[in-house]
Amino acid sequence: MATEYALRMGDGKRVFLTKEKILEELEAGMANASDLGEIPDLSADEIDKLAEILMMPGKAVSVEQGMEVPVTHDIGTIRLDGDQGNSGVGIPSSRLVGCMTHERAFGADTMELGHIDYSFKPVKPVVSNECQAMEVCQQNMIIPLFYGAMPNMGLYYTPDGPFENPGDLMKAFKIQEAWESMEHAAEHLTRDTVWVMQKLFASGTDGVNFDTTAAAGDADMYGTLHAIEALRKEFPDMYIEAGMAGECVLGMHGNLQYDGVTLAGLWPHQQAPLVAKAGANVFGPVCNTNTSKTSAWNLARAVNFMKAAVQASPIPCHVDMGMGVGGIPMLETPPVDAVTRASKAMVEVAGVDGIOIGVGDPLGMPISHIMASGMTGIRAAGDLVARMQFSKNMRIGEAKEYVAKKLNVDVMDLADEHVMRELREELDIGVITSVPGAAKGIAAKMNIEKLLDIKINSCNLFRKQIQ
C-alpha cells in the first residue's frame, strides 16, 4: 500500500494523500494561478521542493539556516486582547503590554499598534488617544513600530457613512450615481488616512501599515494609493507597507486608473509596480485560500502567484500569511503544520523578502511564523534588517549584507542568538533580556541610528522635545 502523508484541506481539516496525489494537486494549483494571472509555471524542481516540504515528517518545519526573513504584522495586539469570537484570545492587557510581548516574548522583528476597530475612519474621534499610546510604546520599544489599520472604504457608505451604497445604486441601474459615490468615498478615504497618519507620525510612529487594501474594490485601492502618494510626499522617511485584501482587485467601479493603469482586475504581479510607484517601501501581496481544496493545491497556487509578484516588484515583498491567505487554512487556530510549511515554502521557493503575519491566534500565527522563518527580532538582528528594508527599500539579500557589514559579522550570524546577544550588549543597541544599565527604548534606537546610518522618527521626536 502506498505511503500516505498528513496534509490539510483549505478549512484546516486533516486529509491523507499519497505522493502521487500531492504532486497532482501541486500541478493543478500551480496551473490555476498560471492561467488566471498569465504567469509562468513553477519549474519541475520547484514543484518537487514543495512536495518535499509538504511530506516532511515533523509537525513543525522551518527554513534552512541563513534564509530567515523579517516579519511584519496585521491586527497588532488584537490577537492578544481582542475577544470577538474570531482569533483574539481575550487576555486582559494593555496595548503597550501586547506590543512588548511581541517584541520580548515572541521575538517579532517589527510590530504595529492598532485600534480595536482596526480601520482608519473610526480612529478619527480617538486619534489623541492613539497618539498617546504610540508615544508610550515608542519610549519603551526597540523594534520598528507601525500604526496599522484598514482603509475599509465600506465604512463610507450608508448606513455607516455619508455616501449612498453603490451596490444599492447598481441594483437600481443608477450606474453613474454608483461611480460617483465610490469616487467621493475614495476621496474621503485618502483625506482621513493622511490626516490620521499626520497625527501619528508627529507622535513618533515609524510608519503605517495599510491592511487589506482594495477590500471594497478598485476605488478602495485608488484611494489608498493616493494616500500613500500624499504621505510619501509629506514624510519622505515614513515607513509604508501596503498589504492587499485579495489576489485580484475587484472592479466595483471599473474605470479608475492609477499612473495610467486600470486598477480593476489586477493580479499580485501587476499590483506591485503601482504600489511602489505610489511610494510604499514594502508590498504585501495576497493569494486567497480555497477552503474546498487541499493544502497542496492552495500552496502551489499561492507560491506561483507570489513568485511572480516578487520578480515584478521594485520593492521588498512581505507576503500576507494570515488565516485564509498564502496557502494557510481558513481557521481561527491555524494548524502549526500547515502554517510552518507555507512559511518555509514562501521563503525558499517564492523568494519573498518577508512575512506579513495576519489573523490567527498567537501560537498559530506569530509564534509559528517566527519559529519557521523569522529573524527573532532583538534576540538577534531581525529589527536591524527590517529597518533597512523600510528605510532604504532594500530587498532581503541587500539588507542582510548591509547590516552584516555594519556589525562586522557574517550574514549567517544575523539570526544567531549567541553571536548577537553579546554584540547587541557591546554596541548598546538593546537586548531582549532586562540588563540593568543597558540602553533601552529611545536610547537603544539612537545607537541603532548611528550604527546603520539612518534616522528613526521616534528619536527625532525625542530630540525635538529636549531642545
Swiss-Prot record:
Record pathway: One-carbon metabolism; methanogenesis from dimethylamine
GO BP: methanogenesis; methylation
One Pfam family of this chain: Dimeth_Pyl
An annotated Gene Ontology molecular function: dimethylamine methyltransferase activity
Keyword Transferase included in the entry's annotation: yes
Reaction catalysed by this enzyme: Co(I)-[dimethylamine-specific corrinoid protein] + dimethylamine + H(+) = methyl-Co(III)-[dimethylamine-specific corrinoid protein] + methylamine
Record has Ligase as a keyword: no
Keywords for this protein: Methanogenesis, Methyltransferase, Pyrrolysine, Transferase
Enzyme class: transferase
EC number in record: 2.1.1.249
Record function comment: Catalyzes the transfer of a methyl group from dimethylamine to the corrinoid cofactor of MtbC.
Family statement: Belongs to the dimethylamine methyltransferase family.
Name of this chain's protein: Dimethylamine methyltransferase MtbB1
Native species: Methanosarcina acetivorans (strain ATCC 35395 / DSM 2834 / JCM 12185 / C2A)
Lineage: Archaea, Methanobacteriati, Methanobacteriota, Stenosarchaea group, Methanomicrobia
Gene: mtbB1
